[in-house]
Structure formats: structure tokens, C-alpha cells
């Protein structure tokens, strides 16, 4: 819940019109993808967005709000769950954040009566 909220809030903060959210399950991994059409992120800045208190564009701070902790929290949750979060963005515009984690299925034991 916290991961979804932080990723969507971040996308809404920087997007001009569109935010898309999808959830997929592939084998034993689930992936949450949040995409926006915001200003984009330069390749050399993609890892920095997960550091606490990092704001890539301080000139937008007053207009967009936030304190630079949302993506750092997502990163910490990903590590705690044995998952990962990554940023795929173009400096020309738009960003995709993918949060993936292992899913452990507990199947019922039908052999005992």
C-alpha cells in the first residue's frame, strides 16, 4: 500500500496529464509499474532518485511539494521484501518506475484428511 501510494503520488506530482499503473504476476514475481508523462530523468540521475532527501529539480520544490523521501521509502521496502525498484526514464520526458518482489504461494495441503 505504501509503495503504490508513494509511486503514484510522485508520478502525479511531476506528470502533466497521464499516469498509468499496472500490476503483473509472472511466475513467482509480482511487478508494479507506474508510468507518467512528466519532465523525464537524465540517465545519470536515475539512481539518485532513491536517495533520501534528493530533489533533482530544486526549482520545482515549492510548486510540487514533498521532501524527497517517497522514493527512498519505496527503495527501503523493496530491499526489505527481497525485491527491487528501478527507474526507466528518458531525459526527453516520461518516467517508469518498476517495483518487483517475490511472491510466495502457500498452497493448501490436500493430502491429509
Question: Where do the model's predicted regions map?
Answer:
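Conserved polar catalytic motif of the HATPase_c/GHKL fold
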Residues: 5-6, 10
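Short beta-strand/loop element within the Bergerat-fold HATPase_c
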Residues: 18-28
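Acidic ATP/Mg2+-coordinating residue in the GHKL
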Residues: 36
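Short conserved segment of the HATPase_c
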Residues: 41-55
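Short alpha-helical Gxxx[C/S/T] motif in the catalytic ATP-binding
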Residues: 70, 74
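Glycine-rich GHKL/ HATPase_c ATP-binding element in histidine kinases
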Residues: 93-97
Amino acid at each position: 500500500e505504501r509503495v503504490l501510494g508513494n509511486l503514484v503520488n510522485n508520478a502525479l506530482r511531476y506528470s502533466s496529464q497521464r499516469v498509468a499503473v499496472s500490476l503483473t504476476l509472472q511466475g513467482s514475481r509480482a511487478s508494479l509499474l507506474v508510468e507518467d508523462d512528466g519532465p523525464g530523468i537524465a540517465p545519470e540521475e536515475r539512481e539518485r532518485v532513491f536517495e533520501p532527501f534528493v530533489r533533482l529539480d530544486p526549482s520545482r520544490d515549492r510548486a510540487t511539494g514533498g521532501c524527497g523521501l517517497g522514493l527512498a521509502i519505496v527503495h527501503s521496502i523493496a530491499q526489505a521484501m527481497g525485491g527491487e525498484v528501478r527507474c526507466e526514464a528518458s531525459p526527453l520526458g516520461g518516467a517508469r518506475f518498476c517495483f518487483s518482489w517475490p511472491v510466495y504461494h502457500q498452497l493448501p495441503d490436500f493430502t491429509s484428511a
